[in-house]
């Protein structure tokens, strides 16, 4: 997320998912109204923005910006009967792992609430959630990316609601990052709660 394209993709898929799940969007707005009371969010608010963090975690579970991660084998290794020789390129895919029913209940559903019982750290330690990669080559900007993502969502959602343009086609375009093939046109609406405070 720390790079501009990964951040843009994470936010794009987050707004798309929120536009399709009004109950989650309402819960996000309720948290922001309670914690922020109309003001601009600050870093000190992040510990209280638990559902906002859960929305971001769940969006990156379903649509990880880095959908495939490659590693070159240094030493011969047996992967359950498949022997990888030095120099072999191994690809892991957060996109595939994050949708695996062996590890996730209702894996194709957008359920930010799942992060109320499973922490990002726990899922990362179990190697079932890795939108930032893993091991010693894990994304150096991960901490910044979480801060940036949570604050972006909170800043926009405290005032605005986004809805998908009626004719918007949704199709994945997995290149280096996972982006929407036809862009993501959305309509922006001022939230009633914000208008009443203004």
Ranges and model annotations:
Residues 6-31, 142-160:
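Cytochrome P450 catalytic-core helices
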Residues 16-66, 73, 80-89, 105-111, ...:
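Cytochrome P450 I-helix active-site segment
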Residues 33-41, 138, 143-198:
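Cytochrome P450 proximal C-terminal region
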Residues 69, 77, 98-100, 118-119, ...:
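Flexible loop/turn segments at secondary-structure boundaries
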Residues 92-121, 197:
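Conserved cytochrome P450 K-helix/beta-meander segment immediately N-terminal to the heme-binding cysteine loop
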Residues 129-132:
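Extracellular trypsin-like serine protease catalytic domains
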């Amino acid at each position: 997320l720390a790079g501009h394209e990964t951040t843009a993709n994470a936010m794009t898929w987050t707004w798309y998912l929120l536009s399709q799940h009004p109950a989650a969007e309402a819960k996000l707005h309720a948290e922001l109204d309670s914690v922020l009371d109309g003001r601009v969010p600050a870093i000190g608010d992040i510990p209280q923005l638990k559902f906002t963090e859960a929305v971001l975690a769940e969006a990156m579970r379903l649509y990880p910006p880095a959908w495939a991660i490659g590693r070159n084998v240094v030493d011969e290794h047996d992967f359950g009967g498949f022997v990888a020789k030095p120099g072999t390129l191994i690809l892991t895919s957060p996109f595939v792992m994050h949708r695996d029913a062996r590890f996730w209940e209702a894996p194709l559903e957008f359920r930010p609430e799942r992060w109320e019982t499973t922490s990002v750290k726990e899922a990362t330690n179990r190697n079932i959630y890795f939108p930032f990669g893993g091991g010693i080559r894990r994304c150096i900007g991960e901490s910044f990316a979480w801060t940036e993502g949570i604050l972006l969502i909170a800043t926009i959602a405290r005032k605005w609601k986004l809805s998908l343009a009626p004719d918007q086609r949704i199709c994945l375009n997995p290149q280096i990052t996972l982006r929407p093939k036809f862009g993501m046109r959305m309509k922006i609406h001022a939230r009633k709660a914000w208008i009443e405070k203004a």
